[in-house]
Amino acid sequence: IVMLKNPIKSIYSRYYVFRNEGLESSSFEDVIKMEMERIKIGDERNELRVNNPDFDDRVNFNYLRHCNYAEKLKTWLKEFKKEQILILTNDEFNADIDKTLKQTFEFLDLPNYTIKNKYKHNVGKYPKMQESTKKLLVDYFRPHNQELYKLIGKELDWDK
């Protein structure tokens, strides 16, 4: 079961988790610019490659590559048939928890079950992202998202 979250929302949330844990002190904008620079030189330096077995995406504060879902899904599709993977989105889940849970139970061939306590835990509140940074991220993720949409057979509204 795969639960996808809009990559921009995901990295913004992840940034604030790291910041609140005292692991990140730079501004979000600086963090994104620095990672984009690391990605540019990553092919030249093995320690910055995600496929390096020594790469630890938490230690390396890897925000952008962490959300390249198409890359990860392609790996899983080499091991599993597409019908063996249920792909959900965080937006669908938040819009209709009961429907998403029913879909999940059906996929797992389990009887439907009503969950009583469906409130959200650990909900973070963050300042609004700068528009220039959001545009930079939309542009960065667009080709990755387009590849994902082809793999899952549907378009999501993440490229806005």
Residue ranges and their predicted role:
Residues 60-68:
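Acceptor-substrate binding/catalytic loop of class I
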Residues 11-16, 22-23, 98-101:
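Short aromatic-enriched loop/helix-cap "lid" or pocket-rim segments at secondary-structure transitions
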Residues 64, 74-147, 153-160:
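The conserved 3'-phosphoadenosine-5'-phosphosulfate
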Residues 10-18, 34-35, 134, 138-145:
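Charged, low-complexity, helix-prone segments enriched in Lys/Glu/Asp/Gln
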Residues 71:
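Active-site glycine-rich loop that binds ribose-phosphate moieties when present
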Residues 4-6, 31-36, 116-120:
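Short C-terminal domain-edge/linker segments immediately following a structured domain
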Residues 1-13:
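Conserved phosphate-donor/acceptor-positioning beta-strand/loop module used by diverse small-molecule
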Residues 16-61:
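PAPS-dependent sulfation machinery
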